[in-house]
Amino acid sequence: MNFARDVVDAADPSALALVERARDGRRREWRFAEVAEGAARLAGWMRARGVGRGDVVMTLVGNRPEWVMAMVACFRLGAVVLPCPEQLRPTDLARSVGVVSPTLVLADPRNRATLEAAALGCPVAYVDESGLFDGPDVAEAVTLRPLDPCLLTFTSGTAGEPKAVLHGQRYLAGQAVQAEHWLAPARGDLVWCTAASGWSKSARNVFIAPWLRGAAALLHDARFDPAARLELVERERVAVLCMAPTEYRVIAARVPLRAAPALRGLVSAGEALNPEVLRIWQQATGLPIRDGYGQTETGQLTGMPAGGEIRPGSMGRALPGTRLWIEDGELVADPATVPTFFLGYLGADGGGEAPGGPWRTGDRVREDADGFLFFEGRTDDVIISAGYRIGPFEVESALVEHPAVAEAAVVAAPDAERGSVVRAVVVLRSGFTGTPELARELQEHTKAATAPYKYPRVVEWADELPKTASGKVRRAVLRDSG
């Protein structure tokens, strides 16, 4: 098996693969023949520089065709690709390199300053360099097995450093299940998954799942603008729109909604959507938002099927063939029935193979009489904000590096648009006073120390943090007090 050969090379060469809408307004259509050739030549270029089967290639490129071709080139060689979000700071990138030891980094030139500050100590190439996508060498696709590694994605833990989740080739082929039963594009459709490159949802839904169904993918490399988002859906005749819950909420609150002639499907995943947002979108477009659920480690587990019964607020039922159950309020999965289940973790916070036996998701879920599942929250301390999963340890570590901070604890606070935001409870050192100016200073300090989406939008002061007898912070007390 090889995704590059079996899907990209095997497609109709003249069929539409990508529609590129660049930041500068440029528009270009990419046929499968162009994508296949560009990826094959990039694979040849990488092979000549020592990249081979099992080697790690890190990408720091936005939602551009160059990112897609870099992914396909890695699949072609049997290399393992780690797509990184462009929001990462130098410290984040350096930490990632320390965990995965990449053979090569492929980057957008706009990220040059970040990479130079990170001083990664490994080869870096920029996607605008001559010869990467039009060089003389073409690499043939190697034959791979389902458990051969292909993809890495970092996930935030509740303590310690983030872990790198390693997926096998089966992860790519396994997307066929959710592509058919949840995303559900038809052959020739245009699908727009707005997830930024580097996030687990982007790896599967920006182009992999659409291509498995014979659909094309829209790539829009620009910041989120609610009005521009709707205009582009109409202009490009998007058939299936996949957005984060926060994006649906913001658009519903800020832009007059209207039906788009070609739009047939709205899907979302990452956190629950409130009933009012669901109502506004359905009333304006005539379409329900079909929710789904998955994790970095598992891929998609549930979904509201196209054409099936819609249960507002539900994340659907288990995908066909996937066995799920609830144990003490927690959703549990049988890995043997999950075709996209991960191979294991890399990193100091949990190396080795995936744990055997049932997979405990750490998510509290309830099930109604008809088998529809409803998300109720996390059993651990991970914060889900605007679809981002944020581990409190990283934010706390950044805060305590500030000279004014003696201790800090981070929990989730409810937010109408983002679902949750990061709330920091801070104990100051002697001589410092909690003021709005200091709160803003701590926010800017955190943005500089780690990825900016992790900064605490709420900063509160406390004389001390609630702790257990052994000295552990009682986060549940802080959550309840918020």
Task: Give the location of each predicted region.
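Structural core segment of the AMP-binding/adenylate-forming
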Residues: 7, 48-49, 72, 76-134, ...
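Conserved pre-ATP/AMP-binding loop-to-beta segment of ANL
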Residues: 13-16, 137-154, 161, 184-190
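Conserved AMP-binding/adenylate-forming core of the ANL superfamily
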Residues: 18-64, 68-72, 89-94, 98, ...
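Conserved AMP-binding A3 loop
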Residues: 29-33, 150-174
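AMP-binding/adenylate-forming catalytic core of the ANL superfamily
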Residues: 88, 105, 241, 364-454, ...
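Conserved AMP-binding/adenylation subdomain of ANL enzymes
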Residues: 173-193, 197-240, 254
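Gly/Ser/Thr-rich phosphate-binding loop
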Residues: 238-243, 252-310, 323
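Conserved ATP/PPi-binding loop(s) of AMP-dependent carboxylate-activating enzymes
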Residues: 317-321, 328-355, 390
